């Protein structure tokens, strides 16, 4: 072996690429020093990180366990089959495809399976908490299919199931979709399943945000009401970036396999499959149910703390990990609030709320999520503190004197992050 070859296999990133290494170090420090309240984020376990960084990443494969298009895949077969078996056990379904590279890829595969160009899709309005991959303009799903939306009740800000049924009867969609990225309330899968059957539509549940809550028994399961279910393995499931497709429909399963590969994807990500298997195994452990229950409890406390301080919460509360804040009465927009919290080392994101402006710069919502901080070990007391800190910041910004509050807020956040470390080295 030449010296160059030895160096290739043994030189760590800090020596090979100092620029990237510095960014990695900075990101590690950021995750330790900031409290992550972006609802789509979480913190994976050391075991998941180990799988992601394993040499299995070198293996290229297409196809499925026992039926590959490349040799040498016997050990990837083991981890993929483990992921399949664990997904079926965890979510109580008969069939699972664990190969989608993302939740959006999973949704595209379902569209590829069930729809023809021009077919009608009915999904939750984006400003009410829906998702781009459900037929929204600007996404591939909205270019090839005729997209329609249902919405939330303007008073309760909860999905208006009567309106959904009326629109479904009028539109007669081929596919009815529920789920999204910023809907904080429990979803009535049974009611929506009945609506879909009434109008002859397939019923897709995208539970990307709530998959971990479903797995942990903290939210009702979409089965047996859904025809097909997609989700990510990130977010509340605490796994790597990737997607799953689940169903009980035996007749669809072979077609579903082909819809993923070769329909919308080529070779799989072998190391990510291993990490998915690990995270699904973790979610089958009894302590995951404790985690899921704590997520709901923490979100409820955060919402209640903010409400008590005069901060309006969309729909008046939460049943999930998401707390959606309406800043309009404070004279602030979402971007201002996002930047304000960042100054105190709290990470959140601007977000539309029901009937918000279509222009992101004018959104008056801010989305908060408790999953990552709950993974760190924070409980109700810590979220009361966080809610108080956030309310203090919002009030001060609205009054034009945030500078006098930021340093105190930052100190309280530093106390919390020191008490709940991430990946201690």
UniProtKB/Swiss-Prot annotation:
Query: Which SUPFAM superfamilies does this one have?
Result: PLP-dependent transferases
Catalyzed reactions: (6R)-5,10-methylene-5,6,7,8-tetrahydrofolate + D-alanine + H2O = 2-methylserine + (6S)-5,6,7,8-tetrahydrofolate
Q: Which GO terms describe its molecular function?
A: D-alanine 2-hydroxymethyltransferase activity; glycine hydroxymethyltransferase activity; pyridoxal phosphate binding
| Gene3D superfamilies (UniProt xref) | Aspartate Aminotransferase, domain 1, Type I PLP-dependent aspartate aminotransferase-like (Major domain)
Q: Which CDD domains does this entry report, sorted A to Z?
A: SHMT
Instruction: Write out the entry's keywords from A to Z.
Output: Cytoplasm, One-carbon metabolism, Pyridoxal phosphate, Transferase
Which pathway is recorded for this entry?
One-carbon metabolism; tetrahydrofolate interconversion
Class in the EC hierarchy, top level: transferase
Q: Where is this chain's protein located in or outside the cell?
A: Cytoplasm
> What residues bind (6S)-5,6,7,8-tetrahydrofolate, as annotated?
126, 130-132
Positions of post-translational N6-(pyridoxal phosphate)lysine modification: 235
Q: Which InterPro entries match?
A: PyrdxlP-dep_Trfase (IPR015424), PyrdxlP-dep_Trfase_major (IPR015421), PyrdxlP-dep_Trfase_small (IPR015422), Ser_HO-MeTrfase (IPR001085), Ser_HO-MeTrfase-like (IPR049943), SHMT-like_dom (IPR039429)
Does the UniProt entry include the keyword Transferase? yes
What does UniProt give as GO cellular component? cytosol
Q: Which domain of life is it from?
A: Bacteria
Q: Name one GO biological process term.
A: glycine biosynthetic process from serine
Provide the cofactor list for this protein.
Answer: pyridoxal 5'-phosphate
Record site: Plays an important role in substrate specificity: 234
Keyword Transferase in annotation: yes
Q: What is its EC number?
A: 2.1.2.7
Q: What does this protein do?
A: Catalyzes the reversible interconversion of alpha-methyl-L-serine to D-alanine with tetrahydrofolate (THF) serving as the one-carbon carrier. Cannot use alpha-methyl-D-serine, L-serine, D-serine or L-alanine.
| Subunit composition and interactions | Homodimer.
What family does the entry list? Belongs to the SHMT family.
Q: Which HAMAP family does the record match to this protein?
A: SHMT
Q: Specify the protein name.
A: 2-methylserine hydroxymethyltransferase
Protein species of origin: Aminobacter sp
